[in-house]
């Protein structure tokens, strides 16, 4: 999107196009370009993490609007849904402890797969979902270790179980299975003693 140096001005220009002729032949592309401008702004230098998250949010909203408003144009609708998932995925790279963003990305890609099963980007969407699940597993493994180091065996066990379910067959799942086996005797002792689980 080469027009203005300011992506905010660029997105405003594309918004003017969409507002002037919402169902014109150029409006769908302009709506998608609004999202792309916000993505470019999020990738810019000298902005805070909070500002970057707001920019990704604006991009997602623009892409979703394209998918919803132009749902009768399959190319635009599918591209908007895929782009929304990709924007959520980019945002999730900044938000290590915010698993909600990853869930939204996975949901967007899952919707894309369900609604457009014959599109060529379906395999890419599946790969992205798998990569994000592995990333979720890595994050949950860190949380499980945190609880284990503080003697909160039941909480650690919950997160280790999530790890093995999210990314079966990975090194994270193997580690989680090993830790679950190590924690089981401690959990059994707590259960037998009637103590409140830690």
Question: Could you tell me what each predicted segment is?
Answer:
Residues 1-198:
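Acidic, polar-rich low-complexity tracts and alpha-helical solenoid repeat scaffolds
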């Amino acid at each position: 999107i080469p027009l203005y140096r300011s992506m905010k001005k660029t997105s405003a220009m594309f918004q003017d196009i969409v507002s002037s002729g919402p169902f014109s032949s150029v409006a769908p592309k302009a709506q998608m370009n609004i999202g792309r401008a916000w993505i470019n702004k999020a990738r810019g230098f000298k902005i805070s993490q909070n500002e970057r998250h707001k920019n990704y949010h604006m991009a997602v909203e623009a892409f979703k609007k394209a998918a919803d408003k132009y749902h009768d144009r399959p190319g635009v609708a599918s591209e908007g849904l895929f782009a929304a998932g990709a924007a959520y995925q980019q945002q999730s790279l900044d938000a290590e402890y915010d698993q909600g963003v990853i869930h939204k990305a996975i949901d967007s890609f899952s919707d894309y797969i369900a609604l457009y099963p014959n599109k060529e980007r379906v395999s890419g969407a599946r790969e992205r979902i798998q990569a994000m699940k592995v990333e979720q597993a890595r994050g949950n493994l860190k949380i499980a270790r945190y609880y284990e180091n503080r003697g909160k065996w039941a909480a650690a066990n919950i997160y280790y179980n999530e790890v093995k379910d999210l990314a079966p067959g990975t090194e994270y799942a193997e580690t989680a299975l090993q830790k679950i086996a190590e924690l089981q005797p401690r959990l059994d002792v707590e259960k037998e003693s009637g103590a409140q689980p830690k």
